[in-house]
């Protein structure tokens, strides 16, 4: 797959993201405009929940999904707070919920808390796309990444996602490989999302090719594969413009 072909495909698989405390309604409106490119729209925008109404207005009839985050970024909020976050987001019009797995509890062996969290996500997000953020850079070990992936997949997660982008280590090729192989081996009807530190067409292309090699080319749709990034879109557009 040449870079231009990859860039065009990746636009439609992108969750164009801005999750910064300095975000404003104006900056989110601009993000929504950027998501609608001459080469097609991004799959989604991923924004803080307080800007969902702005995004709904800007993206009306575009087909672009609105994603937001809960239990973000530390993954250690009380379940009652997470439930309220979900309720607020869905009432505002979110289509997709990216929820941070309680990875600190997971590392401490508190698997019952993790199970309760996953049950809450499944129960509260019926009919919506859920993405469980494992924070693989903090899990570190392959065995932990696989175990956390399995917990999320067995709970019915729509996607398993690498990272919040707020820790020292974000998405890695190695973690993506483990997660994709876990989906394939268990024949789970769940997708994969890489996020955090993916800035260039070449960065994103390697995840696309990895997923293709493990899951097959037919699997590479927005229903199964996403990349979350903020600055990647500019590089994808530049790649297309340059023609190589």
What are these regions (language model features)?
Residues 2-40, 50-192, 201-230, 238-244:
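Alpha/beta enzyme core
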Residues 198:
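Short donor-sugar binding/catalytic loops of nucleotide-sugar-dependent glycosyltransferases
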């Amino acid at each position: 797959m040449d870079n231009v072909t990859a860039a065009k495909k990746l636009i439609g698989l992108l969750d164009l993201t801005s999750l910064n405390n300095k975000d404003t309604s104006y900056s989110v409106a601009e993000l929504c405009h950027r998501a609608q490119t001459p080469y097609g729209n991004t799959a989604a925008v991923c924004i803080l929940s307080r800007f969902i109404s702005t995004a709904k207005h800007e993206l009306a009839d575009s087909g672009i999904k609105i994603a937001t985050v809960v239990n973000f970024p530390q993954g250690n909020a009380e379940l009652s707070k997470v439930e309220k976050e979900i309720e607020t987001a869905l009432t505002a019009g979110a289509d997709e919920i990216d929820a941070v797995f309680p990875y600190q509890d997971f590392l401490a062996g508190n698997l019952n808390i993790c199970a309760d969290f996953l049950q809450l996500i499944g129960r509260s997000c019926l009919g919506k796309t859920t993405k469980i953020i494992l924070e693989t850079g903090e899990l570190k070990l392959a065995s932990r990444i696989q175990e956390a992936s399995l917990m999320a997949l067995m709970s019915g997660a729509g996607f398993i996602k690498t990272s919040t982008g707020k820790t020292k280590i974000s998405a890695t090729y190695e973690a993506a490989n483990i997660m994709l192989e876990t989906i394939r081996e268990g024949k789970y009807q769940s997708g994969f999302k890489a996020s955090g530190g993916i800035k260039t067409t070449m960065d994103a292309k390697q995840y696309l090719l990895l997923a293709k090699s493990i899951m097959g080319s037919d699997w590479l749709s927005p229903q199964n594969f996403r990349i979350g990034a903020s600055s990647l879109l500019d590089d994808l557009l530049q790649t297309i413009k340059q023609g190589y």
